[in-house]
Amino acid sequence: MLENSTAVHGVRLSDSPEDPFLRKRLASNTQLNQKKIRFTENENDLSPERAQKEPVSIPHGRYTWSTSPDTDSSHLPSTPPTVDIPFHHPHTIHSPTFTLSVSPDSQSSSATHQNDYISSPHADFSFSPPASKIQSHEPLNDMAAVHPLRPSHVSGPLSPPEPKAASVDHSINPAYNASFRLPDGPLWTEGSENLPSLDIQLQLAHIYFIYAHGQPYVLFHRDSFMEALKSQRLPPVLVLAMCAVAIRFWQTDKYDKNELFEQWFNRASAIAMANFDKLDLVYVASFVMLSYVCAATSKYWMFAGMAIRMVVALHPNKTPNLPYYDRPDSPLPFEIRVQLTRRLFWDCFMLDRLNSLYCNTQFLNLEDIHVPLPMRETLFMYKAHAVTETLTGKPSSPDSFTNANPTTAPIVSRNAQDNMGMLAYMIRMVSIWGRVVRCLKSYSQKQSNPYPFWHAKSTFKQLDQELYEWEKNLPNRLRYSRQTLLSYHMMGQGGQFACLHLIFLQIHLYVHRYAASISSVPFSHVKSPPTVFENQSAVLASQCANAICRIIQDCTELSISLAAPFTASSAYLAGTVLLYHYITRGSEVQASKAAVHLPIAKRHLAQLSVYWPALGMYAKALDAIAFHQGALVTPSVPPVIATVSKTNTTNTGVQQRGNVGVTTTGSILTQSSPALPVQPVPLAYSKPAPTTKSSLTELAYNTNVSLPPRSPGTGSLAAGNLPNEKAPSLMTMVNGGPVPGDIGEASIPVVQNLQPSTAHVDPESDLGRVIKICDWYQSPSSDVLLSKPLQLNSSEEMEQQCIDLSRHNTLLNLSSYGI
């Protein structure tokens, strides 16, 4: 702050007779142009020999600029500034005052200094301690907090302070000057001939931020991205990749979406692959979006691998201010660049872990990751700087980033956990997901393991403990409830909040689904768990399956788009558990919930298959399981068909959950209407109607809108007496059955108990592929039979050695999910 001027100043030091710090008086006219004096309490340390060798250390206090009578006032400001420098001394809490007097001993040496705060090159430096009766103007304990930047020494000329900008970089990363980043370089020109009109770009960008942003990847800072898009200053390859993602959700009849998608996708992938040797965040983000489009395909693995290797080569933990979609003449603020660099790295990390379900391979090693987790979205949008934790839970050091730019914004909170949002907790959960997949699939890929997965000494024990700690330490602001979901939806983060809890529930369901699902025979090398562990697994899997469907239904009712590809596996895993409870009818309560929630999972899978055609294998696999078990349903009793919701406009006009209906033909979930409505829904806060928020708030607080079906009786729908047909609502699950006329009149038919099916599954079919992906306990080489795994009788010793899952059932607050 005091070293900005290039003029040479003369400094004169003086003190009062009562000076308790220097303990001696200096000559008032001593010129110290070439001398350097170090202030100390011991006068013996102030020897002339040491004074000439040691640097000067200006005492902390209040500095006031004053002029002598013969000073040229044209070089001085109208109002003398005052510089506050914190002061601390063990004998007093009073702040001394230093007066800097400008003298006209010399003139400015160059005209380039005419804009300096003070142009006169000489200043007198006088010191006077405060009176003993005057109290300090600020507490001693708050000195460091109020004055975080304290000059410890002055080497060279002195100058008054200048106003500090909030986010101004003193230096630009040399990567901005790369040849391909020049104003007319290929980064800004290649692919521009394939861009649609600006109006279409803006529409697709708006759709992208509704459907894809934060589910789970966060690639852009929305305000700066939209501003650059409107001014047409974005790299064309980035815009093409964004348009290829957004057009999947664009509902229009004016254009051929398939043709536009192929054109934009092929051009963006060609540009990105041709420039894979140019390490830049633009190409990393392009590969991430291209892999997002190719979910559950071989290209997904290829594009994700390119993005992972490029972002690792950029060293995001060492270079925080990498260039992105900004230019050297208008760079993004330092805080935004730091967070975007972190977010792109963690996006690649989540790509790697989520893809491990399909390819069984993970490239990033946890021991090599030292990048701090992203901060909260609200802090990110307001360009704040915050300290967060690392993936291992240790607080990150702010020195590496604050030292890179000393003018960075002040740290918001010293508590790292307060600065972490849902994206940081989602990254931790995805990390656990990747290790769970690797751990459990090793049981079917390796011939020997020291302990089975349910054993207290197994490798899964540590992962189970991490799951428990994650749920236990989750902040209240991130715990699920319908009202919290609505609150985040009003901030544009509803889909991201739902994805956070879907990943958590999916991990539990992936592990414990073996105990409550119709699936294949377990691998012979995996020892069957004890009865106690199996029962706890069945309860936990059933709870998570119902909770997943309730989250999906809450998003539907609150008009929250939930289009993340990984949610297809969540809905499929939940559907298999619900189908098992519906067919076996081991519990009337579970069967009733399954009848309500099973069509929700089916509808979500059908909707995702429209957005991502490759994910249609999950919907077909669930239909195939129901088809193989369809013979178990009593022919005289029609199977259950459910309606997802029913519109009630008598009071508030909000949607209420409907009940179950029936059809007289076909098996459950085997009939699916090709005209399934998958219309895009706008964000609730974008509607101008004043009653929108209040209506959604009432709906969010209404957690008991779903009624269980009544038992069959005379005149019920189970007897075949259908009500008068009504026009189905937009949210009705249309699969051959009419909309019930009265809530609560549908019933669940009586079905036989489940018997092991001898139906073989073609490994090349959709069901065979899904079983290999989702059933970790299935041997890849064994025959696939649809049956309930037969458990062995466990001994008391085995039950004492198994993992206790009851803590999960206790900690999992099912009431928050509306169950």
Curated annotation (Swiss-Prot):
Modified residues (Phosphoserine): 16
Region spans: Disordered: 28-83, 96-134
Domain of life: Eukaryota
GO molecular function: DNA-binding transcription factor activity, RNA polymerase II-specific; RNA polymerase II cis-regulatory region sequence-specific DNA binding; zinc ion binding
CDD domains, per database record: fungal_TF_MHR
InterPro entries: TF_fung, Transcription_factor_dom_fun
The entry's keywords: DNA-binding, Metal-binding, Nucleus, Phosphoprotein, Transcription, Transcription regulation, Zinc
Primary residence: nucleus
GO cellular component, one term: nucleus
Regions of compositional bias (Polar residues) in chain numbering: 64-77, 96-118
Record-given protein name: Uncharacterized transcriptional regulatory protein C530.11c
